[in-house]
């Protein structure tokens, strides 16, 4: 799931993804936006 959070590093996506999708969620930075996966 792509969320509306800008990023330049994958680590920047972990917190917003966990906040939205729970403790086991992960995140990647793709084209400057965070993509979360369960």
From Swiss-Prot:
InterPro entries: Scorpion_toxin-like_sf, Scorpion_toxinS_K_inh. Gene3D superfamilies: Knottin, scorpion toxin-like (3.30.30.10). Expressed by the venom gland. Disulfide bonds join 7-29, 13-34, 17-36. The record marks 28 as: Basic residue of the functional dyad. One of its GO terms (cellular component) is extracellular region. SUPFAM superfamilies: Scorpion toxin-like. Keywords: Disulfide bond, Ion channel impairing toxin, Neurotoxin, Potassium channel impairing toxin, Secreted, Toxin, Voltage-gated potassium channel impairing toxin. It comes from the Eukaryota. The record marks 37 as: Aromatic residue of the functional dyad. It is found in: Secreted. One of its GO terms (molecular function) is ion channel inhibitor activity. Has the structural arrangement of an alpha-helix connected to a beta-sheet by disulfide bonds (CSalpha/beta). Belongs to the short scorpion toxin superfamily. Potassium channel inhibitor family. Alpha-KTx 02 subfamily. Inhibits human voltage-gated potassium (Kv) channels Kv1.2/KCNA2 and Kv1.3/KCNA3. Does not block human Kv1.1/KCNA1 at 100nM concentration. This is Potassium channel toxin alpha-KTx 2.21. It comes from Centruroides bonito.
């Amino acid at each position: 799931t792509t969320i509306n959070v800008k990023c330049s590093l994958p680590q920047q996506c972990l917190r917003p993804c966990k906040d939205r999708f729970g403790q086991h969620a992960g995140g990647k930075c793709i084209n400057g936006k965070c993509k979360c996966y369960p």
